[in-house]
Amino acid sequence: MQGKVSFFNEGIDFRLLNKIKIKLWINEIILRDKQISSNINIIFCDDLYLSELNLSYLNHTTLTDIITFDYTANGIISGDIYISVERVKENAIIFSKAFRDELNRVMIHGVLHLLGNKDKTPKDKVIMRNKEDQCLILFQSLNA
């Protein structure tokens, strides 16, 4: 079952390109993981907003590009994914990636968290990165 994927801005003026393709991609990733989703909200914001969430909810004082709030219950995938567009832009420069490619990686990173993937240990980080890479390849094939 395809869930609803929605995009919002919080305090910034940002326009996501290819919304329909991104929604299809996210739903395909969930389907391939043999899971069911209801609502996934992706909220684009700035560093300040995400830093405040990070401090309030996780008690972290570091900058981050993404925070995922997982509301999954009874096997139905649901959550809010907050993404700092500022942080993604800066990371794209640091990692010599196109902004859109880095943004896609961060979005799918949040979705993978909703699917139960972790990235706390070095081993988990490698597994997560490999899954992100596989998802990005799928995105390219959907856009071919």
Protein language model regions, located:
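An acidic/histidine-cluster motif and surrounding catalytic segment
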Residues: M1-N104, L114-A144
